[in-house]
C-alpha cells in the first residue's frame, strides 16, 4: 500500500499519564547530536531535533490531551541524506495513548504514527528504521525505567546512511 503512514505500536506496564509525560520529555528518548532544543511539553511549543548535519527538523506541538494524545506538526526539515531534503515538512507525528484492556491495571498502549511517512517517499526506509528503534527501544525504556538505556547516539547512525 503506497499511502500507508508509518506506524509502530508498543505496550508498556506504566499508566497512561506516565507514558504521556515520558513522550513529552522528548530530549530523553529522541537522542541525537546535539539532539532536542526547545520546550516540548506545552501546546504551541516549538522544538528542533538535530542529528549531526544529517537531520534537522522543527516541530510544533499542535495537540495535547493529557494521558491520551500528543501531536507534532513538522514545520521545517532538512534531511541531508536524501534528494528531497524537505520531505518531512508538513508531516505530522502522533502518539495515541490508550488502555487496551481495562481489566489489566497499568497497561498502556502507545500507537505512534508519522503521517506522511509512507513507503513511496525516499526517506521511508531509513526513517522508518530509525523511528522503530526510537519507539521500540528508546521510548519504551524511558517509560519503563525513567531513563534511556538502549539507544545511544550511535544507534541512529546505523539507521540513517551517512
Place the predicted regions along the sequence by residue:
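Hydrophobic/aromatic beta-strand elements that line small-molecule binding cavities or substrate pockets
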Residues: 8-10, 58-63, 91-101
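Short amphipathic alpha-helical signal-transduction/dimerization elements
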Residues: 24-27, 135-147
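Short, highly charged C-terminal tails/helix-capping segments
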Residues: 141-162
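Hydrophobic pocket/interface hotspot
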Residues: 19-23, 47, 61, 72, ...
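Intrinsic-disorder/low-complexity, polar/charged segments enriched in Ser/Thr/Lys/Arg/Asp/Glu/Gln
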Residues: 3-9, 46, 56, 69, ...
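Glycine-rich portal/gate segments that line the openings of hydrophobic small-molecule binding cavities
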Residues: 28, 34-84
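Hydrophobic ligand-binding cavity/cleft-lining segments
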Residues: 1-38
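Beta-strand/loop substructures that line and gate deep hydrophobic ligand-binding cavities in soluble
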Residues: 81-133, 150-154
Amino acid at each position: 500500500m503506497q499511502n500507508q503512514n508509518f506506524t509502530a505500536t508498543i505496550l508498556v506496564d506504566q499508566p497512561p499519564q506516565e507514558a504521556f509525560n515520558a513522550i513529552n520529555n522528548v530530549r530523553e528518548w529522541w537522542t541525537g547530536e546535539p539532539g532536542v532544543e526547545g520546550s516540548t511539553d506545552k501546546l504551541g511549543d516549538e522544538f528542533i531535533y538535530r542529528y549531526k548535519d544529517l537531520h534537522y527538523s522543527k516541530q510544533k506541538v499542535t495537540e495535547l490531551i493529557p494521558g491520551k494524545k500528543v501531536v507534532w506538526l513538522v514545520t521545517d526539515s532538512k534531511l541531508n541524506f536524501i534528494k528531497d531534503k524537505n520531505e518531512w515538512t508538513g508531516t505530522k507525528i502522533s502518539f495515541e495513548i490508550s488502555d487496551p484492556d481495562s481489566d489489566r491495571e497499568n497497561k498502556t498502549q502507545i500507537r505512534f504514527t508519522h503521517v506522511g511517512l509512507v513507503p513511496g517517499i525516499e526517506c521511508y526506509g531509513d526513517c522508518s528504521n530509525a523511528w522503530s528503534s526510537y519507539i521500540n527501544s528508546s521510548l519504551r525504556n524511558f517509560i519503563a525505567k525513567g531513563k534511556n538505556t538502549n539507544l545511544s547516539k550511535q544507534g541512529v547512525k546505523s539507521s540513517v546512511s551517512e
